[in-house]
Amino acid sequence: MKNLKLFLASCLAIACFSIQSANAQKGGVMLYGSFNYHETEAGHQLSAAPLGVGYFFNDNMNVGLNYGFNTSKNKALDFTDHFHEVGPFYSNTWPLGKHFNLIGQVEAHYIWGNEHVVNAANVMADGSYNGYLLRAYPLVGISLGKGWALKAKVAELSYKKKHSKDASIANDHEIITGINGSTVGLGISKNLFIKG
């Protein structure tokens, strides 16, 4: 985990020193993401929901790739569950004045991971899975200046299909609609323009 943090920090530092920020979006690159960490006596959870990089084809249309993960450690039972997602995204922005934007984003992700479950014999078992996740959601963006923005995800419509690789994990699907704790979030983005 320490090496991953060092790698991500190095990539961000290199990007910040080799490209300059600009207010114009067309031809620009957007970096965004949200890191979350939560710790209790029972364990801890680390996630990125998600980290992305996108290219502006015009002032309002952004296409790119994002990656998200969630790692949950249970201290009492001594296990860790992992979830990963990666895939393309498309977003469109509608200005609502000088400092506010309404953003719509859609994503199609490949997912994989491992989890621990209690099986029919009441025994803890672990297994791995893969599948896909389709998601659409609105965001409200607040321009902070010099290419920085604070973005709030306010709802979600998504479909997740999970295919088990092990008998201990059931094939499953999940539909998420509306507003709840898993569909609301804050993140930050930085728009950059590559020197020509």
Where are these regions (language model features)?
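Internal, hydrophobic beta-strand segments that form the core of beta-sheet-rich folds
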Residues: K153-A155
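Short, flexible helix-coil linker/hinge segments at the edges of structured domains or between repeats
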Residues: S158, H163-H173
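Transmembrane beta-strand segments of Gram-negative outer membrane beta-barrel proteins
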Residues: A24-Y37
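Gram-negative (and chloroplast) outer-membrane scaffold detector with strong preference
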Residues: L51-Y137, I142-W148, S182-G196
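Extracytoplasmic loops and strand-loop junctions of Gram-negative outer membrane beta-barrel proteins
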Residues: G33-N36, N119-M124, S168-D172
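Individual transmembrane alpha-helices with interfacial aromatic-anchor signatures
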Residues: D172-G181
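Cleavable N-terminal export/targeting peptides
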Residues: M1-G27, F193-G196
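Surface-exposed strand-loop-strand hairpins of Gram-negative outer-membrane beta-barrel proteins
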Residues: N36-G52, N66, K73, H173
